[in-house]
Design a protein with these regions (language model features):
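Conserved RNase H-like, two-metal-ion catalytic cores of nucleic-acid enzymes
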Residues: 6-9, 13, 19-59, 75-76, ...
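C-terminal polymerase-core module
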Residues: 547-554, 558, 562-611, 781-829, ...
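Conserved catalytic core of nucleic-acid polymerases
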Residues: 525-528, 637-638, 644-645, 649-652, ...
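Function-dense linear segments that define catalytic or interfacial modules
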Residues: 362, 444-470, 484-492, 649-734
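Short alpha-helix plus adjacent loop in nuclease-associated cores
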Residues: 76-90, 141, 146-175, 231-233, ...
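Noncatalytic, basic helical substrate-engagement surface that gates or grips nucleic-acid strands
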Residues: 2-135, 139-163, 240-243, 249-257
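Conserved "right-hand" nucleotidyltransferase catalytic core of DNA-directed polymerases
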Residues: 237-381, 478, 487-669, 688, ...
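Non-catalytic nucleic-acid-binding/docking modules located in mid-to-C-terminal regions
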Residues: 3-5, 56-59, 104, 127, ...
Length: 916
């Protein structure tokens, strides 16, 4: 493309809206409840396209009505497609209103598809001397590619795109030029559009035939030379091939036009766009759009890019520069200012080590870089002791005397207290005052716990209303672009005040200051403690399980009558179970690839009646245990012979901790295989495992929060709660409650906590919907206070948009406003559950901090080494077991005063498996 020609982007509106709808979770809604996830994704892609290509003009094409033009040629064209999802359909008028506010022309014509409008615009634009960018996810558009028409092909998600030029089309199709793409589809067909093509000819064979003969016409002319079944199909379906090519050919004569000279972008009113975005509740993008224009929005645009402060770098060995930086940091510490700290090891992606380690510090005076030297120094500069290195010296004083802000405070603590306990510890994390640390990602998480990522662009846009400048090494970065870690440090400092303000407004400050920040040093200490694992035991278990897996595989293949299929392939497994063996498919859904699902739910339902399915589930469990734990835990051991999990505070929407690398919380607890894995974890010599677990904490919280007199009395009198529920629900004396009735009552008790409805209960107990509904109704009759409480929780959540815990941890639930009944039902169940599950998460976190403090204050040699949901695990010297058990239970049972007692139960064992 030429640099001198004007560039126009023509967006395939239907393609991008469909892609956005399926890529962005359906939890985004306008204030009035209308779904907006497709609009959000569309606008995100729109802005990325503008940033990447800076077109002089933008237009958007949409389908309008049925595709009359192609249906006249092929009546079954797209006939197999299901109706558009109502939530997606509802968003098309809204995106068109937004595009109108953005002054972006909308092109559509009755009976014509957006593809043909893109084709027409490509021709008209090229004739007008413009370079054209066609933004679409449809590969058949590649036929339009020329020197001055490129296709911006959206691929995975919304951000992965490929720029298709004549050369790249040729490479993709192995010698096929853009003009021959319709010929390619003439042979291959297109199942998504119901275009038949020639049976048995896929993309590789279609490419090979056209490359060999030069065109579809020549392939047909030489059809007698094509051997075998493919030749037979070709000769029998010549008319289908010619028709398919015709249908796949993009028209360039749609009845649309555009004045290219008069069309430009951006050319919109800041007020109109702000109002349109505000109506839909998509305010986070407002400044990204305003940054595109001048005029009234110009002031906003001028200040909308985050400015990186001036930088001062102290290179390794430069004593004068080091002294100057140390003086500035000392001043910030003495003044009680927040100092943002980020360590950068300058390593390439995938590398273990970088060439240079740099500590970036941001203060109110600017941005400072301290490079690590090669050796230790005995120098004490301005109150900093650099005996263990520059980075350690600065961080130690910052943590002990200053106020530290970081996007990952725990990782920063590990600079001084390494995860591998065989490495020397320079500072005990518990010595840090939690009121003097501020983790920006944890703060952002508390404000939006359903969000999966808190990347810097999102944080800057949401809390500073600014765009980030490109960092060094990124596409579009200028020569003096900041290092990524430098930008992170500057942004972190800038975020402290607005995040603190937002937390105060959202009632999240108490959770942040009282629960989450005190927990950070505790988690750092637990991660360093790690868990001792026996590699020989793991190896032995793995070998034994491998033998069992082989035996199960043999049994599966014998029952299937197929020695070759891949049991681990969902597609091949589906074929064997449903096509070959004829297992029932009633009620089963097919995947996008056209085969029946073989997920755990499907197989569990079938397992009751089919031995092969039971064996497949057994094979899956054994294979997962072997690959996920037995074969991977050994290599994860550090120099101290221990594995060190990482605790995550910002992953779960409920507030619970999660663990990773390895995930020790997900080892199955009720499975014999899971117990087997835990036998490889042992306490050190002279020590045992101590496990202390809350008993029925969520049910006890339900009793407290609902105030139901029968529920409260049952717990206060120490009754068998599940038996008591069975007696009340089934109308029998407690003495006559059978194990089956108790089991059913237990399922109802825990199901109610999770907002379970009749369908869920019927599935878990394998009973009819009517019976499940009757059980739930009788439960609410037995405990009327529970029904009132849950109804009030849902009503309040619908009014406020969130549910919250006893401690004020909020979970925003946009699904409550969804028009889709299933999503709305999920939102209601989430609202019911959060007060209990979220409060339980808060309580265990508070207990962890208090237990940790008592361990230090009372001189225990024991270490808290693991947290799994409602359980704390310790490695404890044998002579401390009784004292530690008493202390931990005392702390856990008195975190909070409830209407019912909190009960913590303890057990010990030589291995983790024994401590149950």
């Amino acid at each position: 493309m030429s640099d001198k020609r004007r560039t126009f982007a023509v967006i395939d509106g239907n393609s991008l809206m469909h892609r956005a709808f399926h890529a962005v979770p359906p939890t985004m809604n306008a204030p009035d409840g209308r779904p907006t996830n497709a609009i959000f994704g569309f606008l995100n892609m729109f802005l990325k396209m503008i940033d990447a290509f800076n077109p002089d003009g933008v237009v958007v094409a949409f389908d309008k009505g049925k595709p009359r033009v192609r249906m006249e040629m092929l009546p079954q064209y797209k006939a197999q497609r299901p109706p558009m999802d109502p939530d997606l359909h509802a968003q098309f008028p809204m995106i068109k209103e937004l595009l109108t506010a953005l002054n972006v022309p909308i092109l559509q014509s009755e009976g014509w598809e957006g593809d043909d409008i893109l084709g027409t615009m490509a021709r008209l634009g090229e004739e007008a001397g413009c370079d054209m960018l066609l933004v679409t996810g449809d590969r058949d558009m590649y036929q339009l590619v020329t020197e001055h028409v490129n296709v911006v092909s959206t691929r995975k998600g919304l951000s992965d795109v490929a720029i298709m030029t004549p050369e790249s089309v040729d490479d993709l199709y192995h010698g096929i030029t853009p003009a021959l793409v319709p010929d390619f589809y003439g042979l291959k067909g297109d199942t998504s559009d119901n275009i038949p093509g020639v049976p048995g000819i896929g993309p590789k064979k279609a490419s090979a035939l056209i490359a060999q003969y030069g065109s579809l016409d020549e392939v047909i002319a030489h059809a007698d030379e094509v051997k075998g079944k493919m030749g037979e199909n070709l000769r029998a379906h010549i008319d289908d091939a010619l028709l398919s090519r015709k249908v796949a050919t993009i028209r360039t004569d749609a009845p649309v036009e555009l004045d290219f000279e008069a069309t430009s972008f951006p050319a919109f009113s800041a007020d109109e766009v702000s109002a349109a975005l505000g109506t839909l509740g998509i305010t986070a993008m407002q400044n990204r759009f305003l940054a595109l224009i001048g005029g009234e929005g110009g002031a906003a645009a001028a200040s909308s890019v985050f400015e990186i402060p001036a930088m001062v770098r102290a290179a390794a060995g430069d004593a004068d520069a080091l002294g100057a930086v140390a003086a500035e940091v000392s001043h910030a510490i003495d003044a009680g200012e927040w100092v943002a700290a980020v360590v950068d090891d300058d390593k390439e992606e995938g590398a273990l080590f970088g060439l240079t380690r740099t500590l970036w510090l941001a203060t109110s005076k600017g941005l400072f870089a301290l490079e690590e030297g090669d050796g230790a120094s005995t120098a004490v500069v301005d109150g900093f002791n650099f005996a263990h290195g520059v980075i350690a010296g600065v961080l130690a004083r910052l943590f002990m005397e200053g106020r530290v802000a970081s996007p990952d405070t725990k990782a920063l603590l590990h600079e001084l207290s390494p995860i591998d306990s065989s490495e020397p510890e320079l500072m005990d994390p518990l010595a840090v005052d939690s009121t003097c640390i501020f983790d920006t990602v944890v703060a952002a998480y508390l404000l939006d716990s359903d969000r999966s990522e808190f990347d810097e662009a999102y944080l800057a846009d949401t809390y500073l209303q600014m765009a980030l400048p490109a960092a060094r090494g990124a596409e579009g970065a200028c020569e003096d672009a900041p290092a990524p870690a430098a930008r992170t440090a500057a942004l972190t400092l800038a975020l402290v005040a607005p995040l603190r303000e937002c937390m105060a407004r959202e009632n999240a400050a108490n959770v942040f200051d009282g629960i989450e920040m005190p927990l950070v040093p505790v988690l750092a200490k637990m991660e360093r403690a790690g868990m001792l694992v026996d590699p020989d035991r793991l190896h032995s278990l793995s070998e034994g399980l491998a033998t069992q897996i082989t035996e199960v595989e043999r049994s599966i293949r014998d029952l299937a009558g197929d020695e070759t299929f891949n049991i681990g392939s969902p597609m091949q497994l589906s074929h064997v179970l449903f096509d070959v063996m004829g297992l029932p498919t009633k009620g089963l859904k097919k995947t996008k690839r056209g085969y029946y699902s073989t997920n755990a739910k499907v197989l569990s339902d079938l397992a009751r009646d089919h031995e092969i399915v039971r064996l497949i589930l057994d094979w899956r469990e054994k294979s997962k245990i072997k690959s996920t734990y037995l074969d991977t835990l050994g290599p994860l051991r550090r120099g101290d012979g221990r594995v060190h999990t990482t605790y995550n505070q910002t992953i779960t929407a409920t507030g619970r901790l999660s663990s990773s690398d390895p995930n020790l919380q997900n080892i199955p607890t009720r499975s014999e295989l899971g117990r087997t894995v835990k036998t490889a974890f042992s306490a050190g010599e002279g020590s045992v495992f101590l496990a202390v677990d809350y008993s029925q904490i969520e049910l006890r919280l339900l009793a407290h929060l609902s105030g139901d007199e029968h529920l409260v009395r049952a717990f206060n009198e120490g009754e068998d709660f599940h038996a008591e529920t069975a007696a009340r629900v089934f109308g029998v004396p407690v003495s006559e409650v059978t194990p089956d009735l108790r089991s059913r009552a237990k399922a109802v008790n825990f199901g109610i906590v999770y907002g379970q409805q009749a369908y869920g209960l019927s599935q878990s107990l394998h009973i009819s919907m009517a019976e499940a509904r009757d059980m739930i109704d009788r439960y609410y009759e037995a405990y009327p206070g529970v029904r009132t409480f849950l109804d009030n929780v849902v009503a309040r959540a619908k009014q406020t948009g969130y549910a919250e815990t006893m401690y004020g941890r909020r979970r925003h639930i946009p699904e409550l406003k969804a028009k889709n009944p299933q999503l709305r039902g999920f939102g209601e169940r989430t609202a019911m559950n959060h007060p209990m599950q979220g409060t339980a998460a808060d309580i265990i976190k508070i207990a962890m901090a208090r237990v940790s403090r008592r361990l230090e204050e009372e001189g225990f040699a024991a270490h808290m080494i693991l947290q799994v949901h409602d359980e704390l695990d310790f490695e404890c010297p044998i002579d401390e077991v009784e004292r530690l058990t008493t202390m931990v239970r005392d702390v856990m049972e008195h975190v909070v005063d409830l209407h019912v007692p909190l009960i913590a139960e303890a057990s010990t064992g030589i291995t983790w498996a024994d401590a149950k």
